[in-house]
Structure formats: structure tokens, C-alpha cells
Regions:
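Solvent-exposed soluble domains appended to multi-pass membrane proteins
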Residues: 1-128
Length: 128
């Protein structure tokens, strides 16, 4: 379940992980809602970290997720299969890896500052 928590995945990357593995078991959950969320979380972690994610599940979706968030070779629920996909090992850190969730906070602050500045200028022009 660690794939749902960006900080936990980031710890592995900081420690030198060159790809991310997501072993999971969704047997307690009916239908595909949770398994679909896990694939979405794997895509998000791949984008955040610039790494391949290999999701392996005996009861849910198994898949390879590229650093660009593209999903490859996704299996169906409970499909028994052996999947192979060529992945590249990656090093280095993305801005998200360096800033963590603070990246979203800083982006929000910068966006707010731009909006406030533009409104302030418009107000000053209207007052002149």
C-alpha cells in the first residue's frame, strides 16, 4: 500500500532506488475500484520520481509504468501470467523528489502571488 504515499516512495529514491516495485494484493476488495486506484497511484509515483514502477499483484492488476506515466502490459484481475518488459534503471532526483509535497505548496503560493499582483495592478490602474 506504500504506493499511495509519495513520501514513502521518495524515501526509497533518496536511498538510491533506480526503479520502484509495488507488490500488492487486492483480494479483500470487490470489483476493480481499488486496483484501478493503485494503477493511478503507480502512474503518479512514476511521474513524481522519474522512475519505472513495476506493480505486481496475484489478485489485482500487474503492470509496468514508465517514467512518463504510460502503462504497459497491464494484466486483468486474477490473470495468472508471466510478464516481461524492458525497463531502464534511473538515477538522479526530480524536483518532486527534492521538495516532496512542498512542491505543490510552493506552486500554490507562486500562483497566488501572481494573481494578487495582477489584481493589485488592475486596481491601481482603475484608481488612477
Amino acid at each position: 500500500w506504500e504506493i499511495f504515499f509519495g513520501g514513502r516512495v521518495n524515501e526509497g529514491v533518496v536511498d538510491g532506488a533506480t526503479f520502484i516495485i509495488n507488490p500488492t494484493n487486492g483480494s479483500s476488495y470487490t470489483w476493480t475500484i481499488l486496483q484501478t486506484q493503485q494503477i493511478a497511484s503507480s502512474r503518479l509515483r512514476a511521474l513524481e520520481q522519474g522512475r519505472w514502477v513495476v506493480q505486481v499483484s496475484p489478485t489485482g492488476f500487474s503492470a509496468f509504468v514508465g517514467p512518463d506515466g504510460a502503462v504497459y502490459d497491464r494484466t486483468g484481475i486474477t490473470n495468472r501470467t508471466i510478464s516481461e518488459h524492458q525497463i531502464s534503471l534511473r538515477t538522479g532526483r526530480t524536483p518532486y523528489s527534492r521538495l516532496g509535497n512542498n512542491a505543490y505548496f510552493w506552486a500554490l503560493l507562486v500562483g497566488l502571488a501572481i494573481v494578487i499582483r495582477q489584481r493589485s495592478r488592475a486596481f491601481q490602474r482603475a484608481a488612477s
